[in-house]
Amino acid sequence: MSDKLQYVMVDGIKCYSPEVASAYTDYPDSGFDLTDKNAKSSFWVSSRNRLFKSIVQSHLKPTGKTKFLEIGCGTGDFIQQIDQIKNLEITGSEIYIKGLVYAKKNLPSVNFVQFDVTKGTVGAQFDIITAFDVVEHIENDNAALSNISQMLNKDGVLIISVPQHMFLWSKLDEIVKHKRRYSRRELVDKLKANDFDIDYATSFLFILFPLMLISRLFDRGRDQPLSDEQGLEKRVKFSGVLNTIFDSLMRIDEGLIRLGASLPFGGTLVVVARKR
């Protein structure tokens, strides 16, 4: 059983792991600046948030409040999409304080906390926990999944996404400090080992997968003279026209998943798991 962490207040935010709040060892601090600046114009962020909002809505409790925790909320872009959902009691968490400063600025009424999910648990038990593109940054992902399980009520739901397929590994994974990309079997096995049953699993970024594969192969052969910050921005920013086209194509993925399809391959893996 993991320890329940104690907090100190830093910049008006409860910090349960203040010793790592400004370390940025598992994610570049410039990533928060880029996300806050570009999230609303990114086809990937928009599509991901639409899909995950629909999944969260489908798992709300039929009566009373649903207690919700986002692990790795970053600048709060997803919470901005769900903030107005009735009877959803939201907590956002992030290991690095810079993301939370942006999140608190964008959503001053939301409860945000800083903590390292590998070190223990915080707060009350939750009905829904999300971790979108988080555990691939964590060396000890089993510790993170174990603590997430302990923070869920019985039959509580974890909605998790991770980058998929190690053959897609590229400079971008290195810049954002990924430890791994997952296979479906690897993530499912780790979830089952930490007291989860699998409700649903699907790939995402399915329609755009051929373009993603080509871009990753091209990236491997490219000289890398740019700084990590410049390299990150170059790889995640697209023209307005391309963003519009890609956003339209991503809606095909979203529609298929909402219909219950389990897409066989894609750049991202999405799993809905239930605590035993």
Q: For each of these PLM feature ranges, what is it?
A:
Residues 1-132, 142-145, 239-240, 252, ...:
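Conserved N-terminal segment of class I S-adenosyl-L-methionine
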Residues 2-4, 41-42, 122, 208-276:
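A C-terminal cap/extension of S-adenosyl-L-methionine-dependent methyltransferases
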Residues 132-135, 161:
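Residues lining the SAM
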Residues 142-157:
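A short glycine-rich, Lys/Arg-flanked "PGG" loop and its adjoining helix->strand segment in the class I
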Residues 196-206:
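Conserved S-adenosyl-L-methionine
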